[in-house]
Amino acid sequence: MEEPQKSYVNTMDLERDEPLKSTGPQISVSEFSCHCCYDILVNPTTLNCGHSFCRHCLALWWASSKKTECPECREKWEGFPKVSILLRDAIEKLFPDAIRLRFEDIQQNNDIVQSLAAFQKYGNDQIPLAPNTGRANQQMGGGFFSGVLTALTGVAVVLLVYHWSSRESEHDLLVHKAVAKWTAEEVVLWLEQLGPWASLYRERFLSERVNGRLLLTLTEEEFSKTPYTIENSSHRRAILMELERVKALGVKPPQNLWEYKAVNPGRSLFLLYALKSSPRLSLLYLYLFDYTDTFLPFIHTICPLQEDSSGEDIVTKLLDLKEPTWKQWREFLVKYSFLPYQLIAEFAWDWLEVHYWTSRFLIINAMLLSVLELFSFWRIWSRSELKTVPQRMWSHFWKVSTQGLFVAMFWPLIPQFVCNCLFYWALYFNPIINIDLVVKELRRLETQVL
């Protein structure tokens, strides 16, 4: 009976001599260790998966990886992880000396202090400002983005109803009507769309009741004589050049966005989405496969010659296009390489007098896309991932190519109504979505650890 008592007393003496290891026969520091630093847990934070880590270890992991996932099992956590109060109090009571030493080391490490501050700021942005506002935030349906989607849904319904009601008028456009069947009013409409200068001759054409058949027979000499009396040689040349295009096509060539969409629904949808997601590849495609009809007017609009900067309107300037000069190519290539979305914004700016609101939507969207692209480059630079740029470029090229081929294969099967919905969504709704993306990037930049 005496020997067991002695062994028990010896065990208690050993525990008093080594208080950092255990306070009982079966509890040691190793059982409360963090799987990141392999030291005792300080402010233990338990994730949704059940794993616990030191809060500063979790903050360092988040700052370096920018991922909201468990460092051990890689399961994503939901919400913002909090300190396990029960586990923290138990560890502090069992191992007070060890916790005190760890706290002193942590407070002396500036990197850890900054990471904890950034991590907490990130958490404050994720949770409601006050407990009483939790239910109100849920009723708001997710905040700003939910409100945006609600507004977009209402606007989408209005636009789709408008498109449905005006569907017949789209087929009555002059781009679908043979020239020989034009009335005198339609001839005047065609003339006025050449530019503001053409309104000078409106009454002369109306008084003579020039219809489509008569228009096809007019020559340059007749335009210069009574009753038309077009004395300005550049005006006569512009009218004759456009008349030659009308004779060659048999219909009026498209001169604005809606006429272009009516004649080329597939190409307009392709250009809208391609220039939005991959402007550099899209412009390269236009240069290789659609040089005369699309690329040449585009480069002359965004990089005009100095002698072209006269009072002529945009339609008149695009009637007779020559090969770009080296100066135009230099200006284009610089913008193409560094600011591709600026090219789209400049093109839309030149069409403001024709498409007042639509051009403004395009300009705003181009600016937002430029900012988002800048954020992408900043992330690559800050994470030292420049070596991955070639791989990213190849992946992007492969993704865009496969998507384009997929759409081209199934294009005949896609209803026109669906194409119109996609077109209006990308044209008017995408800028509002990009505003929300820019706001999120700015918030993320605030919490980024430098």
UniProtKB/Swiss-Prot annotation:
All copies of domain SAM, residue ranges? 182-249
Name the enzyme's class. transferase
Q: Which InterPro entries match?
A: SAM (IPR001660), SAM/pointed_sf (IPR013761), Znf_RING (IPR001841), Znf_RING/FYVE/PHD (IPR013083), Znf_RING_CS (IPR017907)
What keywords appear on the UniProt entry? Apoptosis, Endoplasmic reticulum, Glycoprotein, Membrane, Metal-binding, Transferase, Transmembrane, Transmembrane helix, Ubl conjugation, Zinc, Zinc-finger
Q: Which residues lie on this side of the membrane: Lumenal?
A: 162-331, 382-404
Modification comment:
Mediates RING-dependent self-ubiquitination leading to proteasomal degradation.
Where is the protein localized?
A: Endoplasmic reticulum membrane
What are the start and end residues of every segment in region (Disordered)?
1-20
Q: Name one GO biological process term.
A: negative regulation of IRE1-mediated unfolded protein response
What EC designation does it have?
A: 2.3.2.27
Gene Ontology terms, cellular component aspect? endoplasmic reticulum; endoplasmic reticulum membrane; membrane; plasma membrane
Q: What does this protein do?
A: Membrane-bound E3 ubiquitin ligase that plays a role in several processes including apoptosis regulation or reticulum endoplasmic stress. Has anti-apoptotic activity, both for apoptosis triggered via death-receptors and via mitochondrial factors. Contributes to the dynamic control of IRE1/ERN1 signaling during ER stress by inducing BAX inhibitor 1/TMBIM6 proteasomal degradation. Promotes the activation of TGF-beta signaling by mediating the 'Lys-63'-linked ubiquitination of TGFBR1 which is critical to activate the pathway.
Q: How does it assemble?
A: Interacts with CASP8, BCL2 and BCL2L1 through SAM domain and also with HIP1, IFT57, ESRRBL1 and BCAP31. Interacts with NGFR; this interaction inhibits NF-kappa-B and JNK-related signaling pathways.
Q: What is this protein called?
A: Bifunctional apoptosis regulator
